[in-house]
Curated annotation (Swiss-Prot):
It catalyses: ergothioneine(out) + Na(+)(out) = ergothioneine(in) + Na(+)(in); acetylcholine(in) = acetylcholine(out); (R)-carnitine(out) + Na(+)(out) = (R)-carnitine(in) + Na(+)(in); glycine betaine(out) + Na(+)(out) = glycine betaine(in) + Na(+)(in). This is Solute carrier family 22 member 4. GO terms for molecular function: acetylcholine transmembrane transporter activity; amino acid transmembrane transporter activity; amino-acid betaine transmembrane transporter activity; ATP binding; carnitine transmembrane transporter activity; PDZ domain binding; symporter activity. It is found in: Apical cell membrane; Mitochondrion membrane; Basal cell membrane. It comes from Mus musculus. It holds the Pfam family Sugar_tr.
Length: 553
């Protein structure tokens, strides 16, 4: 009995058909790159201070001293959320008293920003923060906005696979791209923070669903060798391209509504792809729609200038292949023994903390010294060599050592930021980018590593559970950034410490490189970290390794 890959082997590996599918599906990921990180600019918080209305009769000296000072990063700056009581200083101004000379400012009564705020417009002309005053008592709404987006991502990751299994890869791919583009457009007309946030969560659902289904469609259509490149470098690199495009849009469009409109329009260019991207023949076969599947393969053969054999698919053979039953498993199987439970708990921690590091570094760009647009571009650019490095390392070296190594690298350089003098801002930025490089490399290896640890029976469930843990990490990450408002170095100290910690834990995983993949839970129980013994090694065709999604989204 032949499998699907053997049936379509006559198409070749890298013909015009495969190249077209590779680049079109990868290109469909570009909007995910800039929509996923758009909150950096849509919800940017500029410098702000209490508004002192022009109608208040104050002398120029009292107007200049109407805001108390505080020490921030070693320098005196106006407070963002307090001002001196206007009635009091207006009375002093009318009496001709001078601040600091006739009146001790430290003894003056203070009040909150009763008349609103004035915002610095050097970086952002407007954001959702400036429009709805998400500062001071309401500053908690900003990280919550980002967290709820990732809650949408978490929900979308639940339903995307089930929808594509039921309705088909192609239909769900374009439906979810429409959801992402359509609701992003509706966000432009948000009248309050609540409306914006609900719509943003729906955009998150559409984004991850589009991403996952595009990945599934590519891995099912492309041949074995191309499948590896597509799943490791294709979607990752094009995601990074979208990430790098974001600051270019934001630099020239400083108003959040116009920026959102500009980020929405590229989604319309995906509409013509409907006529070029076919349905997955594998899915059609699973639905017993053999004639449609054969028609797609015939067109692919024609595009590749290959004469297809008559009767490509044998319905009886494929029906026999699809009727193979698998033993039912439940989530408790991931905790059946102490060894399996330990591996599962460590894997959940590894995914969650690595996700926290990746997203916290990505979202913390506005808090870096220097130009926020350049820093965001560099943050996206550094992902490209990180993905290539991860791909090369996975091909040649033991998994747990390379993952632990890049985590030590990423966490270590983040911890070094606290010893860099404030005058050397470029050094701090360089260390942040090196930390992002290490954590991104680690993140991109986790899917492959996790899939190789578990037997076939529970592999998808294990990857799903640990991937869910990474979504939880992304929901938590905005609050690491939020801590930067209290101390600029605190997020880096926490991220660096947790990344080094999880790097140490990674060393206790069993090694999967060059080892026969377990086929059942009993075989997995024999795997032990650091246990010296005879291991069954095989000449593993890397193209037969589990194919899994290896980017943050």
């Amino acid at each position: 009995m032949r499998d699907y890959d053997e049936v379509i082997a006559f198409l070749g590996e890298w013909g015009p058909f495969q190249r077209l599918i590779f680049f079109l599906l990868s290109a469909s990921i570009i909007p995910n790159g800039f929509n996923g990180m758009s909150v950096v600019f849509l919800a940017g918080t500029p410098e702000h201070r209490c508004l002192v209305p022009d109608t208040v009769n104050l002398s120029s000296s009292w107007r200049n001293h109407s805001i108390p000072l505080e020490t921030k990063d070693g320098r005196q700056v106006p407070q963002s959320c307090r001002r001196y009581r206007l009635a009091t200083i207006a009375n002093f101004s009318a009496m001709g008293l001078e601040p600091g000379q006739d009146v001790d400012l430290e003894q003056l009564e203070q009040e909150s920003c009763l008349d609103g705020w004035e915002y610095d417009k050097d970086i952002f002309l407007s954001t959702i923060v400036t429009e709805w005053n998400l500062v001071c008592e309401d500053d908690w709404k900003t990280p919550l906005t980002t967290s709820l987006f990732f809650v949408g991502v978490l929900c979308g990751s639940f339903v995307s696979g089930q929808l594509s299994d039921r309705f088909g890869r192609k239909k769900v791919l374009f439906a979810t791209m429409a959801v992402q583009t359509g609701f992003s457009f509706v966000q432009i007309f948000s009248t309050n923070w609540e409306m914006f946030t609900v719509l943003f969560a729906i955009v998150g659902m559409g984004q991850i669903s589009n991403y996952v289904v595009a990945f599934i469609l590519g891995t099912e259509i492309l041949s074995k060798s191309v499948r590896i490149i597509f799943s490791t470098l294709g979607v990752c690199t094009f995601f990074a391209i979208g990430y790098m495009v974001l600051p270019l849009f934001a630099y020239f469009i400083r108003d959040w509504r116009m920026l959102l409109l500009a980020l929405t329009l590229p989604g319309l260019f995906c509409v013509p792809l409907w006529w070029f991207i076919p349905e997955s023949p594998r899915w059609l076969i699973s639905q017993r729609r053999f004639a449609e599947a054969e028609q797609i393969i015939q067109k692919a053969a024609k595009m590749n200038s290959i004469v297809a054999p008559a009767g490509i698919f044998d319905p009886l053979e494929l029906q026999e292949l699809n009727s193979l039953k698998q033993q039912k498993v439940i989530i408790l199987d991931l905790f059946r023994t102490r060894n399996i439970a330990t591996i599962t708990v460590m894997a959940v921690m590894l995914w969650m903390l690595t996700s926290v590091g990746y997203f916290a570094l990505s979202l913390n760009v506005p808090n870096l010294h220097g130009d926020v647009y350049l820093n965001c571009f560099l943050s996206g650019l550094i992902e490209v060599p990180a993905y290539f490095t991860a791909w090369l390392l996975l091909r040649t070296l033991p998994r747990r050592y390379i993952i632990a190594g890049v985590l030590f690298w990423g966490g270590g350089v983040l911890l070094l930021i606290q010893v860099v003098p404030e005058d050397y801002n470029f050094v701090s930025i360089g260390l942040v980018m090196l930390g992002k490089f290490g954590i991104t490399s680690a993140f991109s290896m986790l899917y492959v590593f996790t899939a190789e640890l578990y037997p076939t029976l529970v592999r998808n469930m294990a990857v799903g559970i640990t991937s869910m843990a990474s979504r939880v990490g992304s929901i938590i990450a905005p609050y690491f950034v939020y801590l930067g408002a209290y101390n600029r170095l605190l997020p880096y100290i926490l991220m660096g410490s947790l990344t080094v910690l999880i790097g140490i834990i990674t060393l206790f995983f069993p090694e999967s490189f060059g080892v026969t993949l377990p086929e059942n839970l009993e075989q997995m129980q024999k795997v032990r970290g650091f246990r010296c013994g005879k291991k069954s090694t095989v000449s593993v065709d890397r193209e037969e390794s589990p194919k899994v999604l290896i980017t943050a989204f």
